Structure formats: C-alpha cells, structure tokens
Amino acid sequence: METATVLIIFIASLLLGLTGYSIYTAFGPNSKELRDPFDDHED
C-alpha cells in the first residue's frame, strides 16, 4: 500500500472513533450525570 492510502485510512478511522465516542458520551448511560450550563445560569 502507498503511504497516502495508509494515512487516509488512519485519519478516517480516527475521526470515526472520535465521533463514536462523542455520541456515546452525549447519549450513553453516563449522559444523565452531565450538567447543562444554561440551566445553571438563571436570568
């Protein structure tokens, strides 16, 4: 394989992993522990 192909596959898998982790963090079982800064700030 060429170096560019390996690099593209690595970057694509890294982006997919980060996206999957952020979705899991936002909507997963621990999402109930996240706080909303807009709810904490009263006008």
Swiss-Prot record:
Keywords from the UniProt entry: Chloroplast, Membrane, Plastid, Thylakoid, Transmembrane, Transmembrane helix
Domain of life assignment: Eukaryota
Keyword Thylakoid: yes
Chief place where the protein resides: plastid
Keyword Ligase: no
GO cellular component, one term: chloroplast thylakoid membrane
Listed GO biological process terms: photosynthesis
InterPro entries noted in UniProt: PSII_PsbN
Chain ranges passing through the membrane: 7-27
A Pfam cross-reference name: PsbN
Membrane-topology descriptor: Single-pass membrane protein
Location in the cell: Plastid, Chloroplast thylakoid membrane
Biological function: May play a role in photosystem I and II biogenesis.
PANTHER family: PROTEIN PSBN
Family: Belongs to the PsbN family.
Name the record gives this protein: Protein PsbN
Species name: Guillardia theta
